[in-house]
Amino acid sequence: MILVLDVGNTNIVLGIYKNKELIANWRLATDNKRTADEYGIQVIELFSHNNLSFSDIEGVIISSVVPNIMYSLEHMISKYFNIKPIIVGPGVKTGINIKYDNPKEVGADRIVNAVAAHEIYKKPLIIIDFGTATTFCAVTKEANYLGGTICPGIKISSDALFDKAAKLPRVELVKTPGVICKNTVASIQSGIIYGYAGQVDYIVSKMKKEMMDLGEEEPFVVATGGFAKLISEESKSIDEINAILTLEGLRVIYEKNK
């Protein structure tokens, strides 16, 4: 079995794979101040609850966009698992050809998503990840990572609205029947949800055109991340949701580098 960790700005997602099957996964809050032992205690509890043992784990791979947390996580893995983890970054084989001006600028999470999507779908792709930031990535059928777009995420955009507009209440992000709303709460909800759905459709439309102008077939659009389901219900562009895309990518990269 292998342990995979996707370290994001808001959450750390952990998964356990037995062969190619995801048998358990959890989500922890990202906290730069936690020590290796504090993370170790959390992982012990998660393993215990699922009747898993640290000795079952043969390898570990980590993808992170939070450099400050890596010392604690690597130390935790070393101390509790006695394993040196694979860290997604320069020198790690991914099978993806990064066409960015500076490939080192591409976030590990975006690379991992590209690896998974290419492995699963084998076609031109637009990958949308609704995380702390919302990212759009263009990948060709030949596994060339062309680039993409980064937008403020739904939660941080909403938080900024609530923090800066004193009279606007915080609201639950749920769909409204339409956009002509009769109260402030519904007006905010519709603005956020339909606004982001429109953003998705517009960016995907432009990205598809640019990819097809390069000779690609019409790209398949896959979405992942916490708000993927909510936005996909209103977006006309998303073909499929894959909630474990990043974990799958980590598994594939581990297999390429073990």
From Swiss-Prot:
Its EC number is 2.7.1.33. It catalyses: (R)-pantothenate + ATP = (R)-4'-phosphopantothenate + ADP + H(+). ATP binds at residues 6-13, 132. Substrate binds at residues 100, 107-110, 184. Its main location: cytoplasm. Disulfide bonds: none annotated. One of its GO terms (molecular function) is pantothenate kinase activity. The active site is at residue 109. GO terms for biological process: coenzyme A biosynthetic process. GO terms for cellular component: cytoplasm. It is an enzyme of class 2 (transferase). CDD domains: ASKHA_NBD_PanK-III (cd24015). InterPro entries: ATPase_NBD, Type_III_PanK. Keywords: ATP-binding, Coenzyme A biosynthesis, Cytoplasm, Kinase, Metal-binding, Nucleotide-binding, Potassium, Transferase. Pathway: Cofactor biosynthesis; coenzyme A biosynthesis; CoA from (R)-pantothenate: step 1/5. A monovalent cation. Ammonium or potassium. It is found in: Cytoplasm. K(+) binds at residue 129. It comes from the Bacteria. Catalyzes the phosphorylation of pantothenate (Pan), the first step in CoA biosynthesis. Homodimer. Belongs to the type III pantothenate kinase family. This is Type III pantothenate kinase. It comes from Clostridium botulinum (strain Hall / ATCC 3502 / NCTC 13319 / Type A). The lineage of its organism: Bacteria, Bacillati, Bacillota, Clostridia, Eubacteriales.
